[in-house]
From Swiss-Prot:
PANTHER family in alphabetical order: AMINO ACID IMPORT ATP-BINDING PROTEIN, METHIONINE IMPORT ATP-BINDING PROTEIN METN
Catalytic activity: L-methionine(out) + ATP + H2O = L-methionine(in) + ADP + phosphate + H(+); D-methionine(out) + ATP + H2O = D-methionine(in) + ADP + phosphate + H(+)
Assigned GO CC terms: plasma membrane
InterPro entries: AAA+_ATPase (IPR003593), ABC_transporter-like_ATP-bd (IPR003439), ABC_transporter-like_CS (IPR017871), ACT-like_dom_sf (IPR045865), MetN_ABC (IPR041701), MetN_ABC_transporter-like (IPR050086), NIL_domain (IPR018449), P-loop_NTPase (IPR027417)
Organism encoding this protein: Burkholderia ambifaria (strain ATCC BAA-244 / DSM 16087 / CCUG 44356 / LMG 19182 / AMMD)
Enzyme Commission number(s) of this protein: 7.4.2.11
Domain ABC transporter as annotated: residue spans: 44-280
Main subcellular localisation: membrane
Cellular compartment(s): Cell inner membrane
Name of the protein: Methionine import ATP-binding protein MetN 2
């Protein structure tokens, strides 16, 4: 019920005719103003502290990043990491305890109530829960913010019908929420968020209540809206699959801190923080249990058993921009080469992935030297390579 009131309150305040926005606060950092000139959303050294019965709790600490105009920017982190707090700072539902938040160059923390109303008209919001009014039709739910704002009926009808067509719900115009699927309800929510032609669309776990197939359809819709309208989208999620499917850039939040950010292909191909690697663990080609049980540690001194092969973990980050030349890798390793596990995929045009292979070290070198030579040859044809053991 609280979430429903939050949604209705957001719609109502967004629909009131905006007054003049307050001027930027005196003494704003030059860094913030400069960054905001080229960014749709800019956070500079942002901190947020909440008072609790046990004292003050820091939800965010020194967070700095920019969202470029027209991109889809994903914020990911585990539950309680501070993702939702970040989104509430962007639309002015919370004010930062330190630092600055700017949307289209406007300092959100310096706005008065009229300025916040103007901001929310330019910043659409898609909520995790659909929060539709059950007694109103699809058309009426989408038209409600326009009706509150006093938009003439003919203009409301034209605008809402166009939006329902955009989100694929023209045939459900006169249906009631009870007859809609979860994905259709979220499409209504997306249409409602677009009624004021926002410059930025914020999505708060917009797919977390949906099944995988419906999630993909909603993500495809958001990507289509981004392309067709040139709309900047900021979404928060705890699912790396969502980031991979639709985002251009990702920021990883862990315990209120920004621990990693960059293009999605780079972060996925070469994660540099433990929190990122943990979030990616569900997408990584981990060794199946039966294969892991077969891999034995290399003996420190003794030779490998006859016929044994060294197991190499070869990784491609996509940094080179080309496709992995698996044939060249096999030729460089020489002898018998077997592919045991893994795969290659493309993210933002970059081929990346992991191959677990078994290769013969050869007999021309002592045991340690042969393995080192094999590893060196593998590294010439991949971004990373390491020895897992032997089979």
């Amino acid at each position: 019920m609280t979430q429903l009131f939050d949604t209705l309150g957001f719609i109502e305040t967004s629909a009131v005719r905006a007054g003049a926005a307050a001027r930027d606060a005196h003494g704003a950092h030059q860094e913030a103003a400069t960054r905001a000139d080229v960014a749709a959303v800019s956070l500079v050294h942002v901190g947020k502290v909440f008072a609790t019965p046990r004292g003050h709790a820091a939800a965010l600490r020194d967070v700095t990043f920019d969202v470029r105009r027209g991109e889809v920017f994903g914020i990911i982190g585990r539950s309680g990491a501070g993702k939702s707090t970040l989104l509430r700072l962007v639309n002015g539902l919370e004010r930062p305890s330190s630092g600055s938040v700017r949307v289209q160059g406007v300092d959100v923390g310096a706005l008065d109530e009229d300025g916040l109303v103007a901001l929310r008209r330019r910043t659409g919001m898609v909520f995790q829960h659909f929060n539709l009014l059950s007694a109103k039709t699809v058309f009426e739910n989408v038209a409600l913010p326009l009706k509150i704002a006093g938009v003439p009926k003919a203009e409301r009808t034209r605008k809402v019908d166009a939006l329902l067509d955009l989100v694929g719900l023209a045939a459900k115009r006169d249906a009631y929420p009870a007859s809609l699927s979860g994905g259709q309800k979220q499409r209504v929510g997306i249409a409602r968020a677009l009624v004021h032609d926002p410059e930025v669309l914020l999505c708060d776990e917009a797919t977390s209540a949906l099944d995988p197939e419906t999630t993909q359809s909603i993500l495809a819709l958001l990507a289509d809206i981004n392309r067709r309208l040139g709309l900047t989208i900021v979404l928060i999620t705890h699912e790396m699959e969502v980031i991979r499917a639709v985002c251009d850039t990702v920021a990883v939040i862990e315990q209120g801190e920004l621990v990693e950010t960059g293009p999605v292909w780079r972060v996925f191909g070469d994660p540099r923080h433990g929190a990122t690697r943990a979030l990616l663990s569900t997408l990584v080609h981990d060794l199946p249990a039966e294969l892991a049980a077969r891999v034995q540690p290399l003996p420190e001194q003794a030779a490998l058993p006859d016929g044994a092969q060294v197991v190499l973990d070869v990784r491609y980050t996509g940094e080179s921009g080309g496709e992995p030349d698996v044939g060249a890798l096999a030729a460089a390793l020489g002898g018998s080469v077997r592919f045991l596990h893994g795969g290659i995929e493309r993210i933002q045009g970059h081929a990346q992935g992991r191959l677990v292979i078994a290769a013969s070290p050869g007999q021309s070198l002592a045991h340690g030297g042969a393995v080192a030579a094999l590893l060196e040859r593998a590294r010439r044809h991949a971004n990373h390579a390491e020895v897992l053991g032997y089979v």
